[in-house]
A protein has these predicted regions:
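Eukaryote-biased, non-catalytic alpha-solenoid scaffold regions
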Residues: 1-464
């Protein structure tokens, strides 16, 4: 037939299938010349930009495929052959985000991931196209101040190699200029109310000002990281904010990387922790790393043990044990597992012991504290019962009964199917249990269920 006739036939066959037809046109254009591809992509981007109809779930996949096809065409067919044009088109592609998100639900995150991929592509293309550092910085600035949907969240990091020192400094100065330009507050009668909170009206100018402040702070922090300027990073946080555990950890890690160990430890020690005793893991991990860097291994070990003791953190326990001398680790592990059995949250204790794994202790904990079992937490009790069933059928049965009892006592009709399955599993385990100790046998338990919940026919119909 020849390639020309074959192409014509394929286009005729694809009539009525718009995505396939667009894909064919792109491929045919690529066989012709990169300029033809660029023209096709430019036209398609313009069409998507002009579209105003809401994209429902029926059309969502088509949109995703369309966006991905345009992005891939820029990357695969243009980036290496026409890098300057590819760079311009990728900027245009990223500008689609606002119009797309304004008419599309992206609760799954699939669409935003396409734009995040495009940002990464932009960085690579910019290195090949080699635009002027100042122009690229200006484009980055204009994008960051219009980052309403988070499409440009990773832009600075992606562009660092192409921006170079001059571009980063230019972008920094533009952000500093923006920091001195607060959003104008209109007269009271001109202010636009866009929502309500417990504190009263939410005004458009307030949101715009918060966005400006956040944009400047995040951009200057990323630039500071790229320039290796720890003090500039720290300067973006006011003194009280630096005392928050998460922020203190971020600052301390940068001071640690700069070998400013005393300042790193001081930053962490000045933190104001929340009440309750639960570890702030980011803060704890940063402190452990700083202590290790200062050769304070005993203090670091004490922190690891404390994290385990307070939260049954398996990660911290493993890190603790592997640093102990031979034979000491066995004794410490036994002490840790005994602590887990006595831990305040029974479900957390069971989850830890099952995953460690220490199934004998998990079974012992279940049987000793069976009255505390909360059957609402099926996400923990179901895998625990599955793990315990082969060797510890009584503990598995008690875990299953807890979920059955909760479903029936609370009349959770939606869970009746699972509860019925759990009851059948209990019946299967019954033959392996030689001693129920102080607990009801399977037959007595089923009899009690029929007495207390006999009228719940929806459940019993599923059992049989």
């Amino acid at each position: 037939l020849g390639s020309t006739r074959l192409a014509q036939l394929l286009i005729e066959i694809s009539e009525g299938n718009a995505p396939a037809k667009r894909r064919l046109r792109l491929e045919l254009a690529g066989a012709d010349s990169p300029t033809a591809v660029a023209n096709q992509v430019r036209k398609r981007i313009a069409t998507i930009t002009r579209s105003r109809s809401f994209i429902d779930w029926h059309n969502r996949k088509s949109l995703i495929d369309d966006l991905e096809a345009q992005r891939r065409a820029i990357v695969d067919q243009l980036a290496s052959r026409l890098p300057t044009e590819a760079l311009e088109l990728m900027w245009r592609f990223l500008e689609l985000a606002e119009s797309v998100f304004a008419r599309c639900d992206d609760s799954s995150g699939t669409v935003i991931n396409i734009f995040h991929s495009a940002v990464a592509d932009l960085g690579a293309i910019a290195q090949s196209a080699r635009p002027s550092a100042e122009r690229l910085a200006d484009q980055a600035f204009n994008a960051l101040v219009r980052n309403g949907y988070g499409q440009f969240d990773d832009l600075i990091q992606a562009l660092v190699p192409a921006l170079g020192p001059m571009g980063l400094e230019h972008l920094k100065q533009r952000m500093i200029e923006l920091s001195a330009q607060p959003v104008r507050k209109p007269a009271a009668k001109e202010r636009q109310v866009i929502g309500w909170s417990s504190g009263g009206a939410i005004f458009a100018d307030e949101i715009a000002e918060r966005s400006r402040v956040s944009t400047v702070r995040l951009a200057l922090q990323e630039i500071a990281d790229a320039q290796g300027d720890v003090d500039a990073f720290i300067a973006q946080y006011e003194e009280p904010v630096r005392k928050a555990p998460k922020i203190a950890a971020e600052i301390a890690r940068r001071l640690l990387a700069a070998h400013r160990l005393d300042e790193a430890l001081q930053t962490l020690e000045e933190t104001e922790h929340r009440r309750g005793g639960w570890p702030d893991f980011e803060w704890e991990d940063a402190r452990i790393d700083v202590l290790e860097a200062r050769d304070c291994s005993d203090e670091a070990q004490a922190s690891r043990w404390s994290c385990f003791e307070r939260a049954l953190s398996a990660r911290h326990l493993r890190e603790y044990l592997k640093r102990l001398p031979e034979f000491d680790d066995f004794e410490a592990e036994e002490r840790a597992l005994s602590h887990a059995e006595r831990y305040g949250s029974l479900l957390q204790a069971i989850s830890f012991l099952v995953s460690w794994p220490s199934l004998d202790r998990a079974a012992r904990t279940v049987t000793a504290r069976a009255k505390e079992l909360d059957g609402d937490h099926y996400e923990l009790l179901t895998p625990a019962a599955e793990a315990l069933a082969p060797k510890y059928p009584l503990a598995a049965t008690l875990s299953l009964r807890a979920m059955i009892d909760f479903s029936l006592m609370k009349s959770r009709v939606g869970r009746y199917g699972h509860a019925a399955r759990h009851l059948r599993e209990c019946q299967g385990l019954a033959s392996a249990i030689t001693d129920y100790a102080s607990f009801e046998s399977h037959d007595i338990y089923v009899g009690r269920l029929r007495k207390d919940h006999g009228r719940k026919t929806a459940f019993w119909s599923m059992v049989s």
